[in-house]
Amino acid sequence: MRRCAVLHRLRCKFYVFVVSLFVVVKLVYLKISMDNSIYIEPYGVTRRSLKPQPLDGINCTAIYDLEPVEIGKSLEMRRKKIVEVDDGRIASFTADCKSYIEQRRYNEVLVTDEECNFPIAYSLVVHKNSAMVERILRAIYAPQNIYCIHYDQKSTKDFIAAMKNLESCFPNVFIASKIESVQYAHITRLKADLNCLSDLLSSEVKWKYVINLCGQDFPLKSNYELVTELRKLNGANMLETSRPSKVKKQRFQFRYQLKDVSYEYQKMPVKTSIAKDPPPHNIEMFVGSAYFVLSRDFVTYVMNNQLAKDFLQWSVDTYSPDEHFWASMARVPGVPGELARSEPDVSDLKSRTRLVKWNYLEERLYPKCTGTHRRSVCIYGAAELRWLLEDGHWFANKFDPKVDPVIIKCLEEKLEEKQLQQCLRRVS
């Protein structure tokens, strides 16, 4: 009996020792993990963000000047685990509109009279990472502009809550009245933009041009610069529109069906053997990208003209219709801002709508990517700051704070500097 009691006490002590050892090891692991992590947070989201941040020590002017020591700092940060605020925290942060607006300094945005008289509309089709969406909104925000946000039916509750909070905090930000379940390369992606365009036309803001963005875009121009460039268009549209290759023609010469797939996208259009009829109204097919800068008159035409409606219906079972719908409509004779069919191709380099760096064209058409690649597209790194700002494009894709938080911070800083300088210059 005594022997059993001794064994029981030994077992208890051993159990306590093992549990204590596990807790110590876990705490050491957490400390090492935290020491090797960088937290990217808008000011005031959590208590941690009230303390000095690693990014505070980055000199963006030195990054712009490609000073080796400062570029080295950014590379050192990228070796660490980069942690961004989750959607729940952003939803909580944006729930108190007064505090949120003050801490993110929306109330300090400066604009000129020229900008006030030239409002811009935005269609933001997003589905995740509310922290990045908020940073995009802050970078393009001006009180005279108007912003439509289309989230995805599949987005998380916290993400949707954060988007709805943004709507609540600003009179010129709203959620699209109709929300799609967006599928990759499917008509739903095009419809998401069309839903926003319809709502934007119904708004009281008499915007001149509309620009569409996704959650991995970022501006390269200040609002003042955008207004200056948009005025130069003089009613024309700006987007890619080129004659399709044989491979691209396959996208609309055959019918596609949305099917379950075993990889990343889960569902996507799959080609069938059923040939499609030619497009209605003898529309000549051109291809481009999903990105556009469109005049109000052109959008009004697309939303109301039977030709455009018929073409949209014809495009329903094509592959990635957003990449040929706009490119083809821009060439239709008689549309506002028409680009004649006989005019040369407008490539992504000629159109200033979006700067995308493809890995197979690097070191031929543009410098090598200093970030990383995802599906052949460069996710920009800090060393590309100067090139991005001097290239001449208006927006770029792709950015990811978990890949390189420095490039986004420095773009924010440089664009704010430019807007301030331009406003002060107009006043003086």
Curated annotation (Swiss-Prot):
Cytoplasmic side: 1-12
Entry membrane topology: Single-pass type II membrane protein
Keyword entries, A-Z: Disulfide bond, Glycoprotein, Glycosyltransferase, Golgi apparatus, Membrane, Signal-anchor, Transferase, Transmembrane, Transmembrane helix
Family: Belongs to the glycosyltransferase 14 family.
GO cellular component: a single term: Golgi membrane
Glycosylation sites: 59
Function: Glycosyltransferase that mediates core 2 O-glycan branching, an important step in mucin-type biosynthesis.
Enzyme Commission code: 2.4.1.102
Gene that this polypeptide is encoded by: gcnt4
Full protein name: Beta-1,3-galactosyl-O-glycosyl-glycoprotein beta-1,6-N-acetylglucosaminyltransferase 4
Reaction catalysis annotation: a 3-O-[beta-D-galactosyl-(1->3)-N-acetyl-alpha-D-galactosaminyl]-L-seryl-[protein] + UDP-N-acetyl-alpha-D-glucosamine = 3-O-{beta-D-galactosyl-(1->3)-[N-acetyl-beta-D-glucosaminyl-(1->6)]-N-acetyl-alpha-D-galactosaminyl}-L-seryl-[protein] + UDP + H(+); a 3-O-[beta-D-galactosyl-(1->3)-N-acetyl-alpha-D-galactosaminyl]-L-threonyl-[protein] + UDP-N-acetyl-alpha-D-glucosamine = a 3-O-{beta-D-galactosyl-(1->3)-[N-acetyl-beta-D-glucosaminyl-(1->6)]-N-acetyl-alpha-D-galactosaminyl}-L-threonyl-[protein] + UDP + H(+)
Pathway field: Protein modification; protein glycosylation
